[in-house]
Amino acid sequence: LRKDRNFLDAYVALGRIVSAEGVALDRNTRTWLAEAEDAYRNAEKIDGENQDVLWYWAQSYAMAGELGIAREKLQDILTFGRGKWITEALAEVDRLQKAERSAPGSKAGIKIGLKSEITRAEWAVLLVEELMLPKLLRKRGHADSPTALPADWPPDIENSWANTWIREILLVGLVGLEVYPDGNFYPDNTLTRAQYAQANQAILILLSGDQSLRHSYMGQESRFPDLRADNYAYNALALCLERGLLKIADRRTGAVNPEGPVSGADALLAIREFQNSFRVEY
């Protein structure tokens, strides 16, 4: 039995390694997924009800963009009703369902949509690839922001994989997704809910032309126990919550958690909300 368990763990490890390397090295998805499936099937032959096998198999399918099949593997875990991965499987099913509903249209969108936390660079990529914001604004007659940039591009985006997308967004000039006072963009920093809300507020104003949105919630008592009404991001967070672009962080306390992260699926759902609200056509 110990020998079988060692073999099972080895097969699971192989499936995980093949999947991680496949994504990191940008190998053909079908090729690395087939190799990972072989490893998991070998593990399954040893113990078909092992939750580690099902969990990591689901993760590999999700990494390959096979969200429906990934969800089926997670449902197999949930049928047990108990076990080490039950709580995680419930959360993962919810995340995958969000990603499926958001229906990303680009390869980058699919990859970013599966992340539990996205970076400032990844948010810029989604705004260009999924919302097509620069193209949309040009079509509506908006010129690039003359005050969006300092004299030079931020030095820390020069070697970023998202350099091109970040430059496009910087030309738009979104508050919350702009250059910091020290001249850097910090592309790899986690996007905070406050920054995300500020950028969404700026997009709402650009698409609607309603400048009053900047101060719609100013002067009122705070709706959130963890954020003062005079905070720089208060108006944007309140606006995004009311417009369905953001959800409350803690339903029990009502906390908004301005410094918390944003998931890729939630970001994509917000983009779909923009497209539906403004009947976006390209």
State where each predicted segment sits:
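Residue-level recognition of tetratricopeptide repeat
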Residues: 7, 50, 84-86
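Repeat-mediated protein-protein interaction surfaces in helical alpha-solenoids
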Residues: 36-40
